[in-house]
C-alpha cells in the first residue's frame, strides 16, 4: 500500500494526460493507501467500511465522527460495532470531553434520547448549564403547524434578535415553511437564502453543522420514524441551539421529560 517514487514523479510530469492522485486512485481499482482519514465516519455502512479497509492494507486510519449524528439506518450504533469486524480491538477511541455550544440541560436531553434509542453516546461536559430546559409542547395533529408558528412568534417578540432555526422533516417542510413565512415574511428564509434572515426553516440535513440561538423541532418523533429508528437527524437537531430548544409534536421520543 505504498506510492513509489516513480509514481510520484509520473504524477508531477507536465503533460496533456496528467492525472491527479485522486483521479488515478479512482481509475485504478488496485490502488492502495498508507493512511486514510475519514470525516463524518458515523454515516458509513458496513459495506463502505469494507471498501475502505481493502484500500488500506495497513489498516491505518484516522476516523472522525459522532455516532449519535448518524442519519443512515445502516450505520453502526457504536464504534466497536463499526470497526471490530475489520481490526478487532486494535483501535484507540478518544472522545471529546467538553461541549462549548449547547447548554447542559439541552445536551443532556439529547444524550438521553440517543441512549434510549440504543446508541452508545458519551456526554461531554457542557461549559454552560443554561437557563432553560427543553420546552416540550405536545398538541393534537391539527394544531402542530399553528403551535410551531406561535413558538416562532413568541421568540421573535422577545426582541433580542435571536437567530431561530425551525427544523422539520422533508415531508412537512413545505407546509411548515409556508406557514412561518406567512406570519413572518420579512424575517424568514431557507437554507438557500439564509443570509440576513432571523428565522430559517430547515431539514435536519440542512441544519447539520449550523448553530442557532433557538431551535424549534417539529414532530421530533417523526424524525426518528422517517429514519427507521436512527437517532441522528433528531440528535443533530437537538444539539444546534445555544440557548433554547422547543419540541412541538403529537408525541415525543423516549428519554424526554414532561411538558414545559
Regions found by a protein language model. Give the residues of each.
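Conserved helicase motor core of SF1/SF2 NTP-dependent helicases
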Residues: 5-7, 17-35, 42-260
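Structured interface patches
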Residues: 12-16
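An amphipathic alpha-helix/rod signature
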Residues: 1-2
